[in-house]
Each structure stands twice: as C-alpha cells, then as structure tokens.
Amino acid sequence: MSAAKQLFKIVPLTPTEINFLQSLAPVVKEHGVTVTSTMYKYMFQTYPEVRSYFNMTNQKTGRQPKVLAFSLYQYILHLNDLTPISGFVNQIVLKHCGLGIKPDQYPVVGESLVQAFKMVLGEAADEHFVEVFKKAYGNLAQTLIDAEASVYKTLAWEEFKDFRVTKLVKEAEDVTSVYLTPVDGFKLKPIIPGEYISFRWDIHNPDITDIQPREYSISQDVKENEYRISVRDIGIVSDYINKKLQVGDIVPVHAPVGTMKYDSISKKGKVAVLAGGIGITPMIPIIEHALKDGKDVELYYSNRSYQSEPFREFFSNLEKENNGKFKLNNYISAENQKLQVKDLEHINPDEYDVYLLGPVAYMHEFKTYLVGKGVSDLKMEFFGPTDPDC
C-alpha cells in the first residue's frame, strides 16, 4: 500500500476550541450511545456500501455503538495529549487494518456523526459546534489514516486473499477447527503467536444479504502452509462455520494482525495464561512458543462443561510431554469449579508474563486483580470491538 492518503489537514485546535469541546464531555458521556446508534442507522441507510465492514450482530446488541461512544468521549477528554489512550487507539488501528478499512471511509463516518449530533442534540449542535467538531474529527481521522498506512506496509499481503478450506475438525460439542490454505499457493510466513485473521463470509442466508466480517485468532503455528482457526457456535456466522462450511469452500482472508502478541524478548522465566472458554485459541501458539523458549508455563483454563472444553486431550498430552514445565489448571463451571483470585496469589509481576482472554466479566474481574497486584504489562485483547467495560 502506498503512502498515507491525505484526506484531512491536521490543524491543532486552539485552547478555546479545546475548552469548548471538553465542556461538552458530560453531554457526550450522557448521550454518546444515542448519538452513535443514530449515526450507524443514518450511515447504513445513506451509505449502504459500508455495511459489509461491520459486524451486524454487534450493532443489534449495541456493543459497537457503545464502543464508539466511549472512543469519542475519551478522545474529547484527551484532546491535548492522546498518550494516555494510545493503547486503546492502537487496538483500533489494528482492527481497522485487519478489516481492510480504507481512508475514503473516514469522511463517510465523519459526515454521519455530524448528522447524528444534529438529530440528537438539536440546537446545541449549532454551526460553531459543527465547525469545531469537524476540525477535531479531521485531526483524529488523519492520525488514524497515517497509523494504518504504516501498519499496512508491514502486512504479508494487501486486501483480502482467497483461502480454501482444507480440513474441518470437531474440537468439542460446539467448537470446530477450520484449516485453510491460500488458493494461489502463496507461502505463509510463521505467525507471531497471538495474531488473528479477518474474514469476509457469505453465509448464503436469504435473510442476510450483507457480507459478514469476522475476526478469529490463529490457533496454531503455520503447518503445511495452513492457518487454523477454532470457532465456537455462538452466533449467525459461527453457526454457519460449525454446521454448513465444507472442505473445498473458498473464503476471503486478510493478513494477520494482533495486539496480544507473545513477548519473545521478555527475560521473565515464567508465564501465566488465563483463558475463559474459546479465549483459549490464541493462547495455544503462545504457550507452545513459551515452552520452546524454556519458560515455565501455567494455564488457568475455565469452561462451562467437559463437553464444551476444546483441546482437552491436547493440553493433557502437553502437560505429560513437558516434565513439569507446563501445569494445567482446569475449572469446569458445571462441576462448581471456578478460578479464584486466591489461585493467582503466587504470581510475582517481576517473574511472570501474564496473558488474559475470555468473556468480558471474566476479564474485568481478573484484570482488576492482576493490575492491583502490580502486573503493569498485562497482555490481553478482546473478541469483537474493544470493550470499554474492561
């Protein structure tokens, strides 16, 4: 991909303009979700061509509007300096790159946001508000465009590439692993453990005509020029993958990206992995690489039931093969087993790298505990939009 497209001129806001926008922060906090929900409705009706870049399930649940509202609020609070939210911004950049977001889509979002503010706030969204907001939005949009252009340059390929399904393996009663290889024979590079790939699914449903974008973690190292993803049946697309996808089917795939990557240069000798349910998928290559590097690895693995626990045999064998270097701690909700913070009391931040992924409530509980314990570099990410609740 070429150099970043210059769609907006970055013009620093004046102190007066910053104060004006920040004075509206309470309004954005209170009405933000209404504004963003209105924005998406307006945008999808006015610019239907962008629908295929959005997960419509996250629209129906309200998760995507909630995340965008949180993003706008945080941006307004940090207009002087984005450094405190740089991690959050970086996750947005990588998700945009994984989905193949183009610079030309930013004016569409900007115009839709302005219309939504006018509809929700009425006279409060006057000419002065619109002028200052457009200036601030343009600064943020061009910053993201520039950052995304830098990421695109590092990816293994541009755009989406057709992959063929080569194998389907049932890992649990509701989890299927999908093996895929490039149709054109492109040689896949080794992954960085923790990366994910984005897909554009046509699920052949007469009631759902839009292409469905989804992101899935790569659940093992590249072998035989194949990626593997492992998908739990919990939604429209995952149901299609588990019940209707067939060997030989073709699906477009974007190059890997990710924020929760294995830290191969860390000098710490121990790794603790906390995985809830299907959050185990990116942890598999992370665990394997950590063991190859000679680290002691502890896995705290929570599932609803034995029947819904993927990779049970794999981890059992891994524990046997590694002579005490890998310790598996299983927690099954149906058996009244639950990971407790007391199980993690021994984790010394100076000795352990810690990885965390699972349902939002699970992540919130253990992130709060681990950060309070002094784990300042906790490695975690979110399935779906970056969640403001965690």
From Swiss-Prot:
Annotated region described as Reductase, given as residue ranges: 157-390
Binding site for NADP(+): 277-282
SUPFAM superfamilies to which the protein is assigned, alphabetical: Ferredoxin reductase-like, C-terminal NADP-linked domain, Globin-like, Riboflavin synthase domain-like
Listed cofactors: FAD; heme b
UniProt KW keywords: Acetylation, Cytoplasm, Detoxification, FAD, Flavoprotein, Heme, Iron, Metal-binding, NAD, NADP, Oxidoreductase
Active site per database record: 106, 148
Site (Influences the redox potential of the prosthetic heme and FAD groups) residue list: 95, 381
Binding site for FAD: 196, 214-217, 382-385
GO cellular component: cytoplasm
Record site feature (Involved in heme-bound ligand stabilization and O-O bond activation), residues: 40
Keyword Acetylation belongs to the record: yes
Residues the record lists as binding heme b: 96
Biological role: Is involved in NO detoxification in an aerobic process, termed nitric oxide dioxygenase (NOD) reaction that utilizes O(2) and NAD(P)H to convert NO to nitrate, which protects the fungus from various noxious nitrogen compounds. Therefore, plays a central role in the inducible response to nitrosative stress.
Homology family: Belongs to the globin family. Two-domain flavohemoproteins subfamily.
Name recorded for this polypeptide: Flavohemoprotein
Organism: Candida norvegensis
